[in-house]
């Protein structure tokens, strides 16, 4: 019970302003707190509350959501936790994480009972492409819930590009880790078996977080690419959390990339690898 109650305690205010610190000590509900990016936690909770009801229906009523390994969330610290997951839709994946994390705050680790939306976990962030989060009203609304927006150096507007790496991304992810939990999709795309980007390995080496591998399935069948429109209802959705791990800070980047690829089960199956090799031979 005490472990659950600690999830409702406010964190120490960020910043040196005396007024900010005084308000924090008096504010047991976190009404005056803001995250490291300046967004009030109250606003984030309102966004999660508003978006949570219709998305709960989509996940747990119109479809069948199964959560495995939720007990691993029990012993996690409140900060410096990095969730790494494969990616199937733009928004349905991360919305599901918000539901699960908010339920875990209330001590629920296997099923979703949406009363947690009255006090959701607001100290959660997710890494997302800036162009995706700026593409309309709904993405902009979701961004307020905790998006750490980055400019992808390899892809823009659906096309492959080459541009300078967004150097601010690592600093912003570090801010998120210092304040709470961060979800990242290390492939940077919803394409299955896409290669893992080295940026994730750099984040792990630089911040030494608790890394929680996650494997999701069924979202691509249930929703369209954005995750906002149904493709097939009554689909089995699965979110499987694996045992948290620490990486050795001295591990080479290539080794971390290989391990991440394996633990989120994104190694290319042999039959697909053979088909790709045959196609390349035919085109050469």
Regions found by a protein language model. Name each.
Residues 4-7, 154, 259, 263:
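Charge-rich, solvent-exposed alpha-helical interaction surfaces
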Residues 134-137, 141, 269, 273, ...:
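A mid-sequence interfacial segment
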Residues 190-192, 243-279:
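Electropositive, surface-exposed helix/loop patches at the edges of structured domains
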Residues 49, 166-170, 260:
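Well-ordered, non-membrane alpha-helical segments in soluble/globular domains
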Residues 39-42, 275-284:
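Short, highly charged C-terminal tails/helix-capping segments
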Residues 43, 47, 162-165, 253-256:
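Residue-level preference for long, well-ordered alpha-helices that form the structural scaffold
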Residues 61-251:
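Soluble catalytic domains of membrane acyltransferases
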Residues 3-68, 96, 136-145:
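A transmembrane-helix-recognition feature enriched in membrane-embedded lipid enzymes
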